[in-house]
Swiss-Prot record:
Associates with the 50S ribosomal subunit. The gene is der. Keywords: GTP-binding, Nucleotide-binding, Repeat, Ribosome biogenesis. GTP 1 binds at residues 7-14, 54-58, 117-120. This is GTPase Der. GO terms for molecular function: GTP binding; ribosome binding. The keyword GTP-binding applies. NCBIfam families: GTPase_EngA, small_GTP. Signal peptide: none annotated. It comes from the Bacteria. InterPro entries: G_ENGA, GTP-bd, GTPase_Der, KH_dom-like, KH_dom-like_a/b, P-loop_NTPase, Small_GTP-bd.
């Protein structure tokens, strides 16, 4: 079931959306027109998942150049939803825009609730009778800013949607299932007698230490949830155009001016029977370019989108040089250890340029780009878009695959045989065991004789060897080390 929240600008639609979803998904600001695209959230209640759609403020008299597209997006949400919430400002009384929206929504013959928001005081509640003229029988007064009567609104939604309440037995079973899933979500990767050097023996203390290391490793929990893919990039590189082209519909508002997208827009899509959630983000700007609080919140949410994504798509403009902002975004992706793919958009404007030469030059500009997969696409001409799904699936599959201990040790043993570590103070680095420790984020744990014998160049050599062996391009990973305990002298 889906609920659409509609209304004129600045009546508190996004505040109600955030209260219902119990998360700050939409930017809330006193500035009119803060929300532009359709935003999707979820209510988890009554043993059900109810999808909620926040829409931009509809004002047909506005001179805002985005208003025509906002109006189109709002009506699309109304058609898509099964329950409608028309939000008004109780302190302003009925406005012309409220009347126009009510006339548009009533003929849809869908359950419609009039939400009289901003009822912060008893004096505000005395104006309820003014809204009978809209012809909507289901009415409720709320104060989203003070979290008043949101629970009553939620119950009214359940009633008009005819969602049955779960029985006491079903609630108890749900709690037991949640507890069971938490217990089973932790699995240990075990191994026995898999040594890098077969003739190397371990003392009892070393064996106990190794068991402790194994207990620290994690394996990915199996999940059927959609894959979250964040499109990141500086303003006006075509992130929203890519989402629209992939979905083959005008799902996100696009414009030639930078900063059109403000909220993070989550868009669900199914491709080849696999579910994805594309997160269209506001472009990251330089700090000096952020002029108001809405832009600051947009940039902050972009970083949050990176943190909650399963995989990031960095979108750059083929017609422009790699910018400071592009490099900053790459560093953020690396900091959050997110698998990523580089999308070079607007390739239709690159006349007389060979793609392979462009990619070679691009790889030389930044060490992180040099290690990632690069796709040259055109959202405008829908060129090479299907490759995005293939690249995302390939990278994510590799990034979530647990590598066997024996295979990791075999690769490192070969690396050490091909290139011996240098001798330091008469001693040489030895690796006794190596474990693929975690998947998200990706990391390896090496059991070595001494940290002081590991040089930076040799560490880089080991990382490059693992990257090439397991195709970890575009997958940031760490090497962690534990020196074996010193043997006790008799």
């Amino acid at each position: 079931m889906r609920i659409a929240i509609l209304g004129r600008p600045n009546v508190g639609k996004s505040s109600i959306f955030n209260r219902l979803c119990k998360r700050s998904l939409a930017i809330v600001n006193a500035q009119e027109g803060t929300t532009r695209d359709r935003l999707y959230g979820e209510i988890r209640a009554w043993d059900s998942i109810v999808h909620v759609i926040d829409t931009g403020g509809v004002d047909q008299e506005s001179t805002d150049r985005f208003q025509k597209q906002i109006h189109k997006q709002a009506l699309a949400a109304a058609e898509e939803a099964s329950v409608l919430l028309l939000v008004v400002d109780i302190r302003c009384g009925i406005t012309k825009q409220d009347e126009e929206l009510a006339k548009r929504l009533l003929p849809l013959k869908k359950p419609l609730i009039l939400v009289m928001n901003k009822a912060d005081s008893q004096q505000d509640l005395q104006r309820i009778h003014e809204f009978y003229g809209l012809g909507i029988s289901n009415m409720i007064a709320t104060s989203a800013s003070h979290d008043k009567h949101i629970d009553v609104l939620l119950e009214r939604i359940r009633q008009v949607a005819e969602i049955p309440l779960p029985s006491a037995e079903e609630q108890e079973n749900t709690q037991e299932e949640e507890f069971s899933s938490k217990e089973s979500s932790v699995a240990l990767h075990t191994f026995a007698d898999e040594t890098l050097f077969e003739n190397e023996s371990l003392s009892q203390e070393e064996a106990s230490f190794l068991e402790e290391l194994v207990a620290q490793t994690t394996t990915p929990s199996i999940s059927n949830r959609p894959l979250k893919v964040a499109l990141i990039g500086h303003p006006n590189v075509g992130k929203s155009s890519i989402v629209n082209a992939l979905l083959k519909e005008e799902r996100c508002i696009t414009d030639n001016s930078p900063g059109t997208t403000r909220d993070n827009v989550d868009v669900s899509y199914t491709y080849n029977d696999k579910e994805y959630v594309f997160i269209d983000t506001a472009g990251l700007r330089k700090a000096k370019s952020i002029k108001n609080s809405v832009e600051w919140m947009s940039s902050s949410r972009t970083e949050k989108a990176i943190s909650r994504a399963d995989i990031c798509l960095l979108v750059i403009d083929a017609t422009q040089q790699l910018s400071y902002q592009d490099k900053r975004i790459l560093s953020l992706i690396a900091r959050y250890k997110k698998p990523h793919v580089i999308l070079v958009n607007k390739w239709d404007l690159m006349f007389g340029v060979r793609m392979e030469h462009y990619v070679q030059d691009l790889r030389k500009m930044d060490p992180y780009i040099g290690q990632a997969r690069i796709l040259c696409i055109s959202a405008k001409q829908r060129r090479n878009l299907s490759q995005i799904f293939s690249a995302v699936d390939d990278v994510y599959t590799i990034a979530t695959t647990k590598l066997s201990t024996s295979l990791v040790n075999k690769v490192l043993a070969g690396a050490m045989q091909r290139h011996h570590p240098q001798v330091i103070n008469g001693k040489r680095l030895r690796i006794y065991y190596a474990i693929h420790k975690t998947v998200t984020p990706f990391s390896f744990l090496l059991f070595i004789n001494s940290n002081t014998l590991l040089t930076k160049p040799y560490e880089l050599y080991l990382k490059n060897t693992l990257k090439a062996a397991f195709n970890l391009y575009g997958i940031p990973f760490d090497l962690e080390y534990k020196a074996k305990p010193a043997r006790k002298s008799n």
